[in-house]
Amino acid sequence: MVDPVALARALIQAPSVTPMDHGCQDLLIRHLEDLGFTVHRLRFGHVENFYARLGSKGRNFTFAGHTDVVGAGDTSRWSSDPFAATLEEGYITGRGAVDMKGGLACMVAATARFLAARPHFAQQHSLSFLITGDEEGDALDGTLKVLQWLESQQEKMDYCLVGEPTSAAQLGDCIKNGRRGSVNGRLTIRGVQGHVAYPHLVDNPIHRAAPVLAAISSMTFDQGDRFFQPTSLQFTAVQSGGSATNVVPGELTAGFNIRFSAMHTPESLEARIRQVLDGAEVDYDLQMMTSGLPFITEGGPLVEAVKATVAQVTGLEPQLSTGGGTSDARFISRHCVQTVEFGLVGSTMHKVDERVPVADLEVLTEVYRRLLERLYPPQG
């Protein structure tokens, strides 16, 4: 039987900072092959990915996740080696403990326990794993390309659970049944460079930009709805000029990000911003790049099954949420209508001394195991 604690520690000890894998996926693959899964290793560029499937009939339930992690930063600030997976006082400390190697370990352990009680499961049903090594990076050679490969192989996912750390304060308090979209923008406002002592010979782009940036930052796109928070635009960088104090710069650049709901498209958001810019009569260039589209799984068998199972195991009534950042569910939901995210408490992810309670690993394993039981009840 697979021990989620031991597997989580082994995964953390592989320093798989994007895009390096360092044998992390091999650990998962060995366990899955032992359980009878057929594994397809899918390397795109410098990124390791794999898709594993057990069975070829019935509905296909997919566990999805990522083995890559963000860097540890200044390791001197950690209480222990970030890749030692230190086990102390009921916690495992290490990079990726909650995001999301702990969740991966629980998925595999739950699958092993479920199949031990259902040795003939694959004769009528299917289980699969979609695992990438490029979620924390640009996400160009990861899940997106695996999904393209699955489509070329006519592989279908009926249900998908992404094991991101969705819980807020307690394991089981939050399920993500959707995510906001994300668009990054770069705005350049051009003027005329010159000496500060000759204002009649310059056109100061900073002066031009100030009211424009204020107008854009105060835009109201919507009021939100029962699934999504109001759309939010935040400026992330403003740059103009150099170190000289007597030169009016020739241009100003500003970066921004928009998190938006399913009420909008990237094109409609860009049109709203251009409307403000055109009305300001400034010389500008606007570039916008979509990093993720919004999705929502409003209801259906998977949402209801996850809610009921979490409540059964944890005793909590989980809230459905679309808040927070983006995840690979934004890609998967285009291929699998029933896509939901549920996992560990994410309060320490990406931080110094990221850690997970050992007890939570056991509880999450039980949630995942009982979820499989609920979706695939014994026949007869």
From Swiss-Prot:
InterPro entries per UniProt: Bact_exopeptidase_dim_dom (IPR036264), DapE_proteobac (IPR005941), Peptidase_M20 (IPR002933), Peptidase_M20_dimer (IPR011650), Peptidase_M20A (IPR050072)
Cofactor: Zn(2+); Co(2+)
Note describing how the cofactor binds: Binds 2 Zn(2+) or Co(2+) ions per subunit.
Catalytic activity annotation: N-succinyl-(2S,6S)-2,6-diaminopimelate + H2O = (2S,6S)-2,6-diaminopimelate + succinate
Residues annotated for Zn(2+) 2 binding in this entry: D99, E136, H350
BP GO annotations: diaminopimelate biosynthetic process; L-arginine biosynthetic process; lysine biosynthetic process via diaminopimelate
Enzyme active site: D68, E135
Transmembrane segments: none
EC number: 3.5.1.18
Any one GO MF annotation of this record: acetylornithine deacetylase activity
EC top class named in words: hydrolase
Metabolic or biological pathway: Amino-acid biosynthesis; L-lysine biosynthesis via DAP pathway; LL-2,6-diaminopimelate from (S)-tetrahydrodipicolinate (succinylase route): step 3/3
Positions annotated to bind Zn(2+) 1: H66, D99, E164
Keywords linked to the UniProt accession: Amino-acid biosynthesis, Cobalt, Diaminopimelate biosynthesis, Hydrolase, Lysine biosynthesis, Metal-binding, Zinc
Function, as annotated: Catalyzes the hydrolysis of N-succinyl-L,L-diaminopimelic acid (SDAP), forming succinate and LL-2,6-diaminopimelate (DAP), an intermediate involved in the bacterial biosynthesis of lysine and meso-diaminopimelic acid, an essential component of bacterial cell walls.
Summary of subunit composition and partner proteins: Homodimer.
Protein family (similarity comment): Belongs to the peptidase M20A family. DapE subfamily.
The protein, known as: Succinyl-diaminopimelate desuccinylase
Organism for this UniProt entry: Magnetococcus marinus (strain ATCC BAA-1437 / JCM 17883 / MC-1)
